[in-house]
């Protein structure tokens, strides 16, 4: 076979989601990756989800993606983060058994309809008249209409450990230099980023009696709406800390760290700093927490989350043995930093297609993100849009009001200067785009696109029907303050009757109290009552937020034609014109985010567009 509609390069989290999404829409897809064992690889921490990240997993699942469902087949320690705060910022997270995850992903991808897997290296991309036509594998052309690059850290990757430098995409695997050259030759701006990983420890050499236990949630909350119950055995994690002796060893050897010797030029992740960064940036802290995370039920490998490092191996040995519980530990693999090329994501459309090269899409770390979840979110969007383009359909765009995926892509296309990680704080509309309502927000859109399985559609529609029925019922149940008092519950004596729905959201009430007042609610699914509780809690705020969303939508609908000649707008300065030509914003809102583009320049563009297009096509979606 040497002809496909879509070719996906790379079999990590972005690549698997991209390939599966395009295949679900019904086009012919090839996924090209080096080795079978690369499918679904988790090269860094053995965990999925977290604050903001867990929201993306739920959103990918709502679009019938893979990451959540596969994680539920491999999750060994579930924990809902931020549970003491409001439901909008709860972060579902799970430790993952690497072997189980890879096995489940391999089985899924290898048996996916419309998807062919090729184990090889892509040497080059063929572009004719600024459109992709093929990829080059083993000197031969594989023809295609669309290419999705999901190369992770493999673009000109270099591993650093002390003064040691190894050309690799990750430890033990060759980097890709040809594709970096190809992207440069296509005129794309590349940058350099860095990430890191800690040493791995043999669990049999740890003194657990000195450590703090960290149990998971008593009842695991699955990521996927398809998962009825998590069946994988659950285990504990453990916590220890660095100390002043640890910090002393690190400080004395900072000159040997690849990060601090000037050897690494790439920018590292602000929110996942190396242990060297931590003791310098947070020198006032006497210690730093380390989470000891098992890599699997049948694995002796422990991932010490919190001490990624690029120090030499001997320094890592000395450092780690100063930590309580790890005094006699055996290191299985040493930590390292990895530096790699990424493409400035301002060169992408919101569909993740490269503006200057038709049919070329980018997803994952190649766009400057960090994390499996961010990669999966981009992968599924790139896959959907590549397939829609093959079918000559409009792109599928999620904006900031729709999803965290929309927030991420909007942030990326407006430009980044460090590895991008998702947090709930990045969203202005987080009350509306919660993890618990991801399917209600996105699954109907996915059904319309045709990228949802029959099973997913049936599960969703059944749940939605039950939820709507229950919502109508609890809104029909009313009770006066006097009646509540007779039931033993105090509320403001203003004579206004409350519905059971409104009671669910009151601070001193909740499901159990409302069930006590209305025992007939005991026959309904408790999970559905929980969803209505969240709706009730945020009801007033959501009504207010609707106005903000309407304003956002108005601004977002002002499209800027790609062929607009900015030289025809006389009031724009030379600097503003140059920046607008460079970044080619698709909307007025995107233009506002370009550094140096002034409010007066924005107004000049709007006036020009209204005059030129007579108030019509500038509000038409492309």
Swiss-Prot record:
For the biological process aspect of GO, one term held by this record is: tRNA wobble uridine modification
Where in the cell does this protein reside? Cytoplasm
| Gene3D superfamilies linked to this entry | FAD/NAD(P)-binding domain, GidA associated domain, C-terminal subdomain
Give binding positions for FAD.
10-15, 122, 176, 365
Keywords, in A-Z order: Cytoplasm, FAD, Flavoprotein, NAD, tRNA processing
What InterPro entries does this protein map onto? Answer: FAD/NAD-bd_sf, GIDA_C_N, MnmG, MnmG-rel, MnmG-rel_CS, MnmG_C, MnmG_C_subdom, MnmG_C_subdom_sf
Out of the domains of life, which is the source? Bacteria
Q: Give the matching NCBIfam families.
A: mnmG_gidA (TIGR00136)
Q: What is this protein called?
A: tRNA uridine 5-carboxymethylaminomethyl modification enzyme MnmG
- Which source organism does the UniProt entry give? Orientia tsutsugamushi (strain Boryong)
Q: Which gene encodes it?
A: mnmG
